[in-house]
Amino acid sequence: MRYTTSFIGLCFLIFLLKNLVNGGLIRECDYTMEGYGPCGPNGRSLCLDTFWKTPPSPGLSKNLEGCRCEDRGKRPPIFTGLSHTCRCCWSYGGGSDD
C-alpha cells in the first residue's frame, strides 16, 4: 500500500510539473466592463451576465473565478442615469493555443 501511494503521488507531481512547463494555468484579473444602472442586490449576477456576453478572449476554455460590481454614480452630462463597473477574474489553461 505504501508503494501505491508513493506511485500516485509521483504521477501527480509529474502531471503538475508538466502543466507548469507547458504554460499551466493563467489567471487574469480586473477585466473591466462598464454598464448602465446601479449594481443593487443582484450586482454579481449582472456582472456575470455581462461577462458571458462579452468574454475577454473567445476560443479559450475559461473558468470564471468571480466578479465584483462597483457603482460609479452619474455618467457624464451627455448621458443620463447611473452606471456601474464590473471587475472580473478568470483562469484558463495556457501554452498550447498559439
Swiss-Prot record:
Signal sequence, start to end: 1-23
GO CC annotations on file: extracellular region
Entry keyword set: Antimicrobial, Disulfide bond, Fungicide, Plant defense, Secreted, Signal
Localization terms from the record: Secreted
Keyword Transferase among UniProt keywords: no
Cystine connections: 29-89, 39-69, 47-86, 67-88
GO process annotations (BP): defense response to fungus; killing of cells of another organism; signal transduction
InterPro entries assigned: SCRL (IPR010682)
Family: Belongs to the DEFL family.
Name of the featured protein: Putative defensin-like protein 239
Naturally occurring in which organism (per UniProt): Arabidopsis thaliana
Phylogenetic placement of the source organism: Eukaryota, Viridiplantae, Streptophyta, Embryophyta, Tracheophyta
